[in-house]
């Protein structure tokens, strides 16, 4: 196995019913909130902290009744995400790529959402290629499959190619939403290389594709975050704090090597992968240099600035570039004691 496969970098929504809040750790004395958490992906390892929080009782301890609501009806992420945004009245908090909030003409245009905690710092994405492509130079004249033009995965792929001497136009970029459809393009022969997440990347490895680079090599980012509507957040701050405390406890649990076997069980539950594959996925999380999973949900403003700068570099955002505060609000993580 290519050792570079072990060098890498990992969303949902909520509706809560009002109630009187009590201090952390006193769930028996407080009224429970039903938290409807909508997701636009299936079997995604980004749900690891939430699953661990459920399995280990961290949501219960904080008085949270966690109920996922899935926006995956069509299997096409852009379509499902459009449906999600149109269903504003069915959720209050969301797990989403930070970049989605930044897109000037994106699906969240005109909304009032802000990130309050981090789900995944650097993305666990692999730039893979068929066996005859040994170096980036071999990509010249080939077709590379990536997400949308404004997706940070596409942008970091472009940055990686530029770092290795390729110019715009040297490689044809075919945009396909979703890692599994990109795997299909690779296996069909229509695409020579592409960027894939876990666990879809394993199907590419099984088909003979190999890793050219990990996207983290393009530099640190803040990839996936929990977002809330600012107006709703102003009147539900303690609910947000409880949620952050529960997922922060889960992240600390995941980082503790003594809990590996329990974390593997959670990963198997989410991804429906065999235990051996779940352990392989988690190996990327355990490699500190990849900085995939936050220590406890904290937001790295330096990484936010880097993500904004990446959007500026490729013309998605025009200057002067906005400050991080336009997209993130640290107050809730601070109140939860994780920031």
Which residues make up each language-model segment?
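Pocket-lining segment of extracytoplasmic ligand-binding domains
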Residues: 97, 180-271
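Conserved C-terminal helix/tail region of periplasmic/extracytoplasmic solute-binding proteins
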Residues: 305-339
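Sec/Tat signal peptide C-region and signal peptidase I cleavage site
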Residues: 23-29
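Short, glycine-/small- and polar/acidic-enriched structural segments
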Residues: 30-167, 173-176, 182-185, 192-198, ...
